[in-house]
Amino acid sequence: MEKKFFLSFLFLLPFFMILVIAESEEENPDDLIQLGVTRNKIMTAQYECYQKIMQDPVQQTEGIYCNRTWDGWLCWNDVAAGTESMQHCPDYFQDFDPSEKVTKICDQDGNWFRHPASNRTWTNYTQCNVNTHEKVKTALNLFYLTIIGHVLSIASLLISLGIFFYFKSLSCQRITLHKNLFFSFVCNSVITIIHLTAVANNQALVATNPVSCKVSQFIHLYLMGCNYFWMLCEGIYLHTLVVVAVFAEKQHLMWYYFLGWGFPLIPACIHAVARRLYYNDNCWISSDTQLLYIIHGPICAALLVNLFFLLNIVRVLITKLKVTHQAESNLYMKAVRATLILVPLLGIEFVLIPWRPEGKIAEEIYDYIINILMHYQGLLVSTIFCFFNGEVQAILRRNWNQYKIQFGNNFSHSDTLRSASYTVSTISDGTGYSHDCLSEHLNGKSIHDTDNVVIKPEKLYD
């Protein structure tokens, strides 16, 4: 026990000395926080390494080998002579890429490689930051691409919601589901922008790991679940309408509200409790944990169930069309087609995530594709469910035509008034007749009756 304490004290002493010196200097508070986090990580790794060195059994294999060691940043196991050991770069520093590799060579004599310039044992960390500049540039591009995607999504979704709320003739249960789906995407885009700009992009905040950023991540994951479960509600509604209720019109929407807004709370809460117990760090942002399957699992299940419902709906509708050729079946087929297009598009990123390719260019292309698929979903949903919707297009076209006719009639009415005024002034100057003569120029009607001449726009569509 005394030996362990002495070793720990001996190797931690330089870090405490550095800490005292650093505290005497004036530095940026954020830099001090990041520096403190880096020191804590190194000290923790060092302590765990020496614990491992003392507790692991002695090498029993025959032959020459290099002894286990701590190189200052990473811990290395016993390695056979003439081989190269490799592990991932540490995440101590912002310019280190944990996906890159660190190498350490054990020579033929069973000694760790020494650098010729210093004649000291040396570990090759050069690959950890060799591509940092390019990766930072790519990360910034992806960041701006994400923000643009969510801004466009919010704008298109709000326009769509405005259309649905303004035109009362569009009100029906399916449009109500659309409204909830759109609202969930708006909320998700807003919280994502806040989360990316205020939390994920603030290394000092992530390092301190406050409760506020964990709440932000919790809301973000909850709303992401709401997006997919409202898509499931769309599929269930159509399935009930077409397959179960045989074209019945009314359904109870309470269960849809529970599924769309209530059920995603369950995996979000379970994930929060698990992260609090096992991975309570980095504002719960780190993705190198299997706990994310608590969120992604139900989402994938919802996508699969939705796909099954939609395929079954298509089967039933095709059968009905062959037998009855009902126009109503054609209308349902159009609604199903829109949902059937969206389901694979909204879920394809969960299929692609495990298949990340190898290679710099391939990884960059993959990142851009995943980024677009994930962060432009709101724009895609509003485009397919609203802007490409035949009913919406028809009512917008009809109202636009009414506006043009009304504007044209108002313009003609203004010209009529100007013409009448000119005629009155001419007659007054020439003959001195009363203004009642104006009625002849208005086909026997007075000025106040001219509104009755205007064609009523709504009559055009009776």
From Swiss-Prot:
The chain crosses the membrane at residues 141-165, 177-199, 211-239, 254-274, 291-315, 331-352, 368-388. Residues 23-140, 200-210, 275-290, 353-367 are extracellular. It comes from the Eukaryota. It is a multi-pass membrane protein. Residues 166-176, 240-253, 316-330, 389-462 are cytoplasmic. The record marks 203, 374 as: Required for ADM interaction. One of its GO terms (molecular function) is adrenomedullin receptor activity. The record marks 289 as: Required for RAMP2 interaction. The keyword NAD does not apply. Glycans are attached at residues 67, 119, 124. One of its GO terms (biological process) is angiogenesis. Disulfide bonds join 49-75, 66-106, 89-128. Its main location: membrane. The keyword Glycoprotein applies. Keywords: Cell membrane, Disulfide bond, G-protein coupled receptor, Glycoprotein, Membrane, Phosphoprotein, Receptor, Signal, Transducer, Transmembrane, Transmembrane helix. Residues 289-290 are annotated as: Required for RAMP3 interaction. InterPro entries: GPCR_2, GPCR_2-like_7TM, GPCR_2_calcitonin_rcpt_fam, GPCR_2_CGRP1_rcpt, GPCR_2_extracell_dom_sf, GPCR_2_extracellular_dom, GPCR_2_secretin-like, GPCR_2_secretin-like_CS. CDD domains: 7tmB1_calcitonin_R (cd15274). It is found in: Cell membrane. Heterodimer of CALCRL and RAMP1; the receptor complex functions as CGRP receptor. Heterodimer of CALCRL and RAMP2 or CALCRL and RAMP3; the complexes function as adrenomedullin receptor. Belongs to the G-protein coupled receptor 2 family. G protein-coupled receptor which specificity is determined by its interaction with receptor-activity-modifying proteins (RAMPs). Together with RAMP1, form the receptor complex for calcitonin-gene-related peptides CALCA/CGRP1 and CALCB/CGRP2. Together with RAMP2 or RAMP3, function as receptor complexes for adrenomedullin (ADM and ADM2). Ligand binding causes a conformation change that triggers signaling via guanine nucleotide-binding proteins (G proteins) and modulates the activity of downstream effectors. Activates cAMP-dependent pathway. This is Calcitonin gene-related peptide type 1 receptor.
